[in-house]
């Protein structure tokens, strides 16, 4: 997927984040800043990365984001609760206002995040939502042509792209 996104003219930063097991907001959100995210950035976040993309967009302008395996609650999990993403209410209007577009990909057979979570996020963001039935938690590392096509379509709608 990285190569496919680069072929769209994107400078792809695919880096393991610090604290990648606990995925704490207090570490990840400043790291997104360190990577140089700005109004021309497309954030693509999977699982905890999707939560980070949401929280980042509450207070920062980005071009757009793609959220894969997203949720809005800690799912009753102590580790998720400790991550810091779920302490404050979600500022859906700010997330939406701070970017031109948002796409969500989820699978109804995700063993970690119930599909109702992603549907809830999509309903609050009034964004593009794509629901699969057989992708689990999208951890198979296979190509993801649907995501690449979505980004391609969105970039084509941005003036000057």
Model-identified regions with their sequence ranges:
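Gly/Ala-rich beta-loop-alpha elbow adjacent to hydrolase catalytic centers
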Residues: 44-54
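Conserved alpha/beta-hydrolase fold motif
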Residues: 43-44, 104
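Active-site nucleophile loop of the alpha/beta-hydrolase fold
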Residues: 17-20, 66-75
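Catalytic histidine neighborhood in serine/cysteine hydrolases
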Residues: 11-13, 122-138
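Active-site catalytic motif of lipid deacylating hydrolases and related acyltransferases
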Residues: 1-39
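Conserved alpha/beta-hydrolase "acid-adjacent" motif
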Residues: 111-117
């Amino acid at each position: 997927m990285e190569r496919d996104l680069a072929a769209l003219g994107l400078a792809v930063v695919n880096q393991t984040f610090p604290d990648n097991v606990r995925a704490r907001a207090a570490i990840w959100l400043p790291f997104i800043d360190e990577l140089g995210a700005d109004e021309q950035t497309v954030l693509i976040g999977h699982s905890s990365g999707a939560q980070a993309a949401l929280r980042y967009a509450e207070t920062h302008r980005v071009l757009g984001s793609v959220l894969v395996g997203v949720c809005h609650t800690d799912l009753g999990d102590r580790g998720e609760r400790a991550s810091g993403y779920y302490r404050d209410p979600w500022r859906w209007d700010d997330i939406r206002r701070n970017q031109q577009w948002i796409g969500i990909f989820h699978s109804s057979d995700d063993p970690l995040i119930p599909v109702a979570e992603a549907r809830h996020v999509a309903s609050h963001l009034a964004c593009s939502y794509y629901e699969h039935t057989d992708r689990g938690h999208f951890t198979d590392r296979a190509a993801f042509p649907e995501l690449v096509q979505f980004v391609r379509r969105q970039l084509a709608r941005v003036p000057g792209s």
